[in-house]
């Protein structure tokens, strides 16, 4: 979550007249994240999240994102729910941006996830994949293999100013991924951005997932690979195999991986690291000074890329044979 677009109380009040959520008592911007502008609203009826969709978010995708949240909730998954306006729509206009309000999800994200948190996230992710199996809408992943090289080309010229040799490293990784990216793996709705700040907990209990604005239709095991990158590396960039095993155990206890998915996991994990390095690198080089946004260091994912190059099997991530379907 982040804030790119400032709003004032007058225009917010006019926007809220289209909703039946009580009287506004306070609001504040949420600085974390990089994509859209987000505000926490407190009203006489409760707490809500207001999102203004910035230029990276295609308005045509909003029915998919908001409809997915509704669908998953109906299937029993805890996640924010879009608040319907008085005219029956879910999307309005505020400060020249498409905007929506969703319910507030109780809980906190874990800055230092434990093994128990990792297992709960893996289990929750598998439940999300199953719950989304009959979601009727589809959305192409706009940040997958065919998109990585064009994105890289936007930053390539300046990449070595961030880390000497980064151009050569990234070119080699992209060449490898283009030659080895798996085909014909099970696909469905994936979150695609399930970082610790997008999973809320009450103690060790998972209270739900948020921020579905990268959700799309893609390889299910790729979502697992994203989580291995996001949840199982320590501050010193070492991979915590115990956390990886817990996350994979949680996932496969609900949805076992096929043998093909297990074999592809090392390529998918390497690809996920490249994907997040590329978007972080682009933001690092282009987000304007003074923007109310916390930029994220692309080098965190360069170090993950280096780790994945050494992996030879999914067992090194902690995958146990009982988690693989015969």
From Swiss-Prot:
GO MF assignments: ATP binding; homoserine kinase activity
Reactions performed catalytically: L-homoserine + ATP = O-phospho-L-homoserine + ADP + H(+)
InterPro entries according to UniProt: Aminoglycoside_PTrfase, Homoserine_kinase_II, Kinase-like_dom_sf, Pseudomonas-type_ThrB
Keyword presence, Kinase: yes
Enzyme Commission number: 2.7.1.39
GO biological process, one term: threonine biosynthetic process
Alphabetical list of Gene3D superfamilies matching this protein: 3.90.1200.10, Phosphorylase Kinase, domain 1
Origin: domain of life: Bacteria
UniProt cross-references to SUPFAM superfamilies, sorted A to Z: Protein kinase-like (PK-like) (SSF56112)
One Pfam family it belongs to: APH
Signal peptide: none
Pathway annotation: Amino-acid biosynthesis; L-threonine biosynthesis; L-threonine from L-aspartate: step 4/5
Keyword Transferase in record: yes
UniProt keywords, alphabetically: Amino-acid biosynthesis, ATP-binding, Kinase, Nucleotide-binding, Threonine biosynthesis, Transferase
PANTHER family: AMINOGLYCOSIDE PHOSPHOTRANSFERASE DOMAIN-CONTAINING PROTEIN (PTHR21064:SF6), AMINOGLYCOSIDE PHOSPHOTRANSFERASE DOMAIN-CONTAINING PROTEIN-RELATED (PTHR21064)
Family: Belongs to the pseudomonas-type ThrB family.
Protein name: Homoserine kinase
Species of origin: Brucella abortus (strain 2308)
Lineage of the species this protein comes from: Bacteria, Pseudomonadati, Pseudomonadota, Alphaproteobacteria, Hyphomicrobiales
